[in-house]
UniProtKB/Swiss-Prot annotation:
Catalyzes the phosphorylation of the position 2 hydroxy group of 4-diphosphocytidyl-2C-methyl-D-erythritol. It comes from Caldicellulosiruptor bescii (strain ATCC BAA-1888 / DSM 6725 / KCTC 15123 / Z-1320). The keyword Oxidoreductase does not apply. It comes from the Bacteria. SUPFAM superfamilies: GHMP Kinase, C-terminal domain (SSF55060), Ribosomal protein S5 domain 2-like (SSF54211). This is 4-diphosphocytidyl-2-C-methyl-D-erythritol kinase. Pathway: Isoprenoid biosynthesis; isopentenyl diphosphate biosynthesis via DXP pathway; isopentenyl diphosphate from 1-deoxy-D-xylulose 5-phosphate: step 3/6. Its EC number is 2.7.1.148.
Amino acid sequence: MKLKAYAKINLALDVLSKREDGYHEIRTIMQTVDLYDIINIEKIEEDNIIVTTSSENIPTDNKNHAYIAASLLKERFGVKQGVRIHIEKNIPVSAGLAGGSTDAAAVLKGLNEIFELNLSEQQLMEIGREIGADVPFCLVGGTALCEGIGEKVIKLKSAPQMNILIAKPEVYVSTQAVYEALDLSKIKKRPNIEAMISAIEEGNVKEIAKNLCNVLEVVTVNQYPVINRVKDIMRNNNALGTVMTGSGPAVFGIFGNKYNALKAAERLKVFIKEIILTTTCEGSGF
């Protein structure tokens, strides 16, 4: 079985509070983009999970999200057959694009079908939560408001199709470290989530671009000023709006046309290796 595992971007990301368990309560609008890993899954006779990948930058053992997803399903539902999973990696790793979470979501969907478990979307989302906060959204895809630690997913009207340029600087960002460094009392600019939802419902690309905002950006930029350099180049080449996604370091810009996006990509190529021009999309859904 071959599945597409789509990346996500955060159009808006607000952090509300820190919980007693150490996690943070957030409100974010997530959006699927037409950038995906390809996941090949096949049954094998021996009771084992084998993960291989085209990338040297991700683990293939029980630290891999796809492996964890397979292990959880097998254990919970007493599946004795094994699986071989191959991940053809196209989504930049550790970028804020949910690369690991979306692979896990694809494996949950695929194994639900292969092993005829007949689990509902809701049941898969509950299992997905145990793997990572972005997994439930990745199961649903499209455009959604996510709350809690990101695991509560409220579907929104689909955003209009937009030209999205993604650039990932070659720096490593720890999500945990970014959240720990965030001082909630010093956040000066928060996203207007309601204005973003209205812009999405109206299909107003310029208003969507105007309302892009991520409160984590100030923390990551403080450590890696290259993020601001990427944003400046996008803006100087007519991006309608630009923002960091997730905890970074990937940045995306919304462009009114592909010509401007390609111009920005040419400028960025001087110091950024991973640059992707794509569009928003619905993803694979359930």
